[in-house]
């Protein structure tokens, strides 16, 4: 092989090695020039160089990727998780509830809806709507579990004592 041909082959080998070992797509590799070099070469020096360099590395480029994937899949996941729910609710008010103050909160006797708090009904519908704001309350329910209730746009209807949430 001539010195300039040897240098071209060396550059081609380095390019192939870099792309192959970096696990990059080889679409942009100059395959036509590689095929031409292989056809023009009287002996298989180029193939020998490629095989020797490949054998010297002793690993395939994707072996490390498969090892990392296996470690990731075999890792134990935590059983602890968090869930969140958006609940819409409508609470029917009973006359047996105890009210405190002229515009204080209410606490229904013996019910999980005791977690909710609201304002005493105001005289006009516009005042009732203006006084409502998004609120959230948390506490123990009748089952002994913690409950979180979020209310929004709450205002009492005039005659039925139903609270619309």
Curated annotation (Swiss-Prot):
Q: Which UniProt keywords apply?
A: Methyltransferase, S-adenosyl-L-methionine, Transferase
Q: Provide the coiled-coil residue spans.
A: none
UniProt GO MF annotations: methyltransferase activity
The keyword Cytoplasm appears for this protein: no
Instruction: Tell me yes or no: is Lipid metabolism among this UniProt entry's keywords.
Output: no
For this protein, the Enzyme Commission number is 2.1.1.-
Q: What InterPro entries does the annotation carry?
A: FAM86_N
Q: Name one GO biological process term.
A: methylation
- Similarity remark: Belongs to the class I-like SAM-binding methyltransferase superfamily. EEF2KMT family.
Please give the name of this protein. Putative protein FAM86C2P
Q: Which gene encodes it?
A: FAM86C2P
